[in-house]
Amino acid sequence: MSGRAQRQHPGRLTKRAEFLAVQRGLKLRGRLFLLELLARGDDDPPRVGITVTKKVGNAVERNRIRRRLREAVRVHAADDMATGTDYVIVGRREILDAPFGALKDELSRRIRGNKPARTG
């Protein structure tokens, strides 16, 4: 095993009810995406859900936006996520034209700057 610290891989939000629950939390609007977050109040790994509405474009464009967001979370932002927190990222069309470096920096900056306070 190497000397590097173990990365905590975020889980996934899969059910509609989980996505709807996060809507009650903090909303951070930006040019590239909307970030919603909600503290669950436990010490489990963070969970992430990514969604792109049909208003954004056709299926090919929506899938490309999802892939870019997933990779930005995997490569850069996962280390900044707080345990016991659910995150929903709503992608916008501008992600298609944004440089990947700008996307991952913006995502990391928003997550790092807004770790929610514990509730409960």
Curated annotation (Swiss-Prot):
GO cellular component entries: ribonuclease P complex
Pfam family, one: Ribonuclease_P
Group of enzyme by EC: hydrolase
GO terms of biological process kind: tRNA 5'-leader removal
Catalytic activity: Endonucleolytic cleavage of RNA, removing 5'-extranucleotides from tRNA precursor
InterPro entries: Ribosomal_Su5_D2-typ_SF, Ribsml_uS5_D2-typ_fold_subgr, RNase_P, RNase_P_CS
EC number: 3.1.26.5
Keywords: Endonuclease, Hydrolase, Nuclease, RNA-binding, tRNA processing
GO MF annotations, alphabetized: 3'-tRNA processing endoribonuclease activity; ribonuclease P activity; tRNA binding
Family statement: Belongs to the RnpA family.
Entry function: RNaseP catalyzes the removal of the 5'-leader sequence from pre-tRNA to produce the mature 5'-terminus. It can also cleave other RNA substrates such as 4.5S RNA. The protein component plays an auxiliary but essential role in vivo by binding to the 5'-leader sequence and broadening the substrate specificity of the ribozyme.
Subunit structure as annotated in this protein's UniProt entry: Consists of a catalytic RNA component (M1 or rnpB) and a protein subunit.
Annotated protein name in UniProt: Ribonuclease P protein component
Organism annotation: Chelativorans sp. (strain BNC1)
Record lineage: Bacteria, Pseudomonadati, Pseudomonadota, Alphaproteobacteria, Hyphomicrobiales
